[in-house]
Amino acid sequence: MASNVFSEIILFVSVLIITAAVSGILATSTHKISLGLEQRGDALSSQLTKDFEIINDPGYVLKNATDTTMIYLKNTGKSPITFDKEVISVLVDGNPVEISNTYVEGDSSVRVLGSSKVGKLHITYNTSGYHRFKVVTSEGIARTFTGEIV
């Protein structure tokens, strides 16, 4: 009789240990999933609040006397965008081009494009005709524009 009691106690304790281990694993997994969702939500929120548009006239993309082409961007998001030639990339017809300078309209010394502000990119590209421009920010936000350099 006593051996049955000990067997049942051992089985009961074993079940308790297994149950505790399984619940610990489930709690840890749930916590990791929760953290992952929170991080992805923060990243998506950051991308949604940082947005811009290329506002050039498609029929008249300006080229100045030093053969640099000007691309105008407007920050249409709620958060400022880093506006520096080191963190912005420009592709013309799929090929990367050098940005010679960046300017924020109204204050050329600022390197942050605030909400609703307009910035100007000077790119070293001077071939006339229709071209496809793609601007990519450091946050990975990209906009494409087709226009004629005159």
From Swiss-Prot:
UniProt keyword annotations, A-Z: Archaeal flagellum, Cell membrane, Membrane, Transmembrane, Transmembrane helix
Which Gene Ontology molecular function entries are recorded, alphabetically? structural molecule activity
Which cysteines share a disulfide bond? Answer: none
Against InterPro entries, the record matches this protein to: Flagellin_arc
Q: Which residue windows are transmembrane per the record?
A: 9-29
Q: Which GO terms describe its cellular component?
A: archaeal-type flagellum; plasma membrane
Region forming the signal peptide: none
Q: How does it sit in the membrane?
A: Single-pass membrane protein
Q: Which GO terms describe its biological process?
A: archaeal or bacterial-type flagellum-dependent cell motility
Localization annotation: Cell membrane; Archaeal flagellum
Q: Which family does it belong to?
A: Belongs to the archaeal FlaG family.
Put simply, this protein is called Putative flagella-related protein G
Source species: Methanococcus voltae
Q: Which gene encodes it?
A: flaG
